[in-house]
Amino acid sequence: MKTTYVNATIVTMNEQNEVIENGYIIVENDKIIDVNSGEFASDFEVDEVIDMKGKWVLPGLVNTHTHVVMSLLRGIGDDMLLQPWLETRIWPLESQFTPQIAVASTELGLLEMVKSGTTSFSDMFNPIGVDQDAIMETVSRSGMRAAVSRTLFSFGTKEDEKKAIEEAEKYVKRYYNESGMLTTMVAPHSPYTCSTELLEECARIAVENQTMVHIHLSETEREVRDIEAQYGKRPVEYAASCGLFKRSTVIAHGVVLNDNERAFLAEHDVRVAHNPNSNLKLGSGIANVKAMLEAGIKVGIATDSVASNNNLDMFEEMRIATLLQKGIHQDATALPVETALTLATKGAAEVIGMKQTGSLEVGKCADFITIDPSNKPHLQPADEVLSHLVYAASGKDISDVIINGKRVVWNGECKTLDEERIIFEASRYKRGLQR
């Protein structure tokens, strides 16, 4: 099946950050086979031609760190620091989850993400009360591209920890698929919730199965103080001593890093998922993304969960990310629009090991989203496309979402998820949780 999308303004995110006016994209099954400008007069025979009527077409956004199973917990822990937020709000409520609640919560997060332009994401879920196979089936049904990882903790007894490791290893062996629509990573929660033995076992699983690692690290000053007091090392050095960086690793946050740590992370191919809104809301601080990029670290933008954000709008994250860097460095050139877009598309895809997506180029997967600026005053005059995408647009502006060549959202309607049912069930299940 070959489909041509014509009469579009195409934000390619290729090496030149080329924007093609009056362009077209040809998709064969799940791949892009041509991207060009001008009237469509290709040598390719196509089955369908779709007039985009001047819409902006850009790569699907890539969310490098989130927790969709927590989507029912939106708004339950506002105005709290990380540790009390986790200990008095999040973990007690997650302990009440059932497989049905977890699926309903996941569906809500998936629906929000895909309708706001996210096509790929990396996720960590707490396995308590969760049917992991049902979660993976739900993500698959959404049509999204994802790395969904089972989180490990050292809560309970040593026997509980051993069982958690065994279950996580089985999960990795079952779901790791580097080039598929769904894959996974090894995901110890953090150095303050995992024992040294558990972190070492996670490193072993990652090496033996050739997977990536995903962990919260260097998120707060308190974490750094506590880990240094307990182990005599800061979190980066401690994680490295446990062997976690033997495989490509994504650290969520990296708010509290010094120059030596940034150089070390770059040398060991440790990538950072940058969560600006969540870090601000939890009072964790502001990550120095400018310094990370200058050190050579791969960085991708992320939302974290709705419980700490409180939405999954990657356009908002792009805008906040670039404004924060300009503000803390008192440098208006810090994190320009092209870089911000890269950190939410091609660069983010590289961070989570999904190089097959993130830009609109021949050979890449057909993952793209559209915005119709014609009826949106906040996107006018419409000729400054890149600026508007970062500084003016929002997830509410999305018209269409194509993932792997399939129309997942079309004219604002999600084709893979039942929006009315999901919203109804989310409210019903939320009322059953006891604070």
Swiss-Prot record:
Coiled-coil boundaries: none
GO molecular function: 5'-methylthioadenosine deaminase activity; metal ion binding; S-adenosylhomocysteine deaminase activity
Binding site for Zn(2+): 65, 67, 216, 304
Assigned EC number: 3.5.4.28, 3.5.4.31
Cofactor annotation remark: Binds 1 zinc ion per subunit.
InterPro entries: Amidohydro-rel, Deaminase_MtaD/DadD, Metal-dep_hydrolase_composite, Metal_Hydrolase, MTA/SAH_deaminase
Keywords: Hydrolase, Metal-binding, Zinc
Catalytically driven reaction(s): S-adenosyl-L-homocysteine + H2O + H(+) = S-inosyl-L-homocysteine + NH4(+); S-methyl-5'-thioadenosine + H2O + H(+) = S-methyl-5'-thioinosine + NH4(+)
Record: residues binding substrate: 94, 150, 189, 219, 304
Cofactor(s) essential for the protein: Zn(2+)
Described purpose of this protein according to its UniProt entry: Catalyzes the deamination of 5-methylthioadenosine and S-adenosyl-L-homocysteine into 5-methylthioinosine and S-inosyl-L-homocysteine, respectively. Is also able to deaminate adenosine.
HAMAP family hit by this protein: MTA_SAH_deamin (MF_01281)
Assigned protein family: Belongs to the metallo-dependent hydrolases superfamily. MTA/SAH deaminase family.
Protein name (Swiss-Prot/TrEMBL): 5-methylthioadenosine/S-adenosylhomocysteine deaminase
Source organism of the structure: Bacillus thuringiensis (strain Al Hakam)
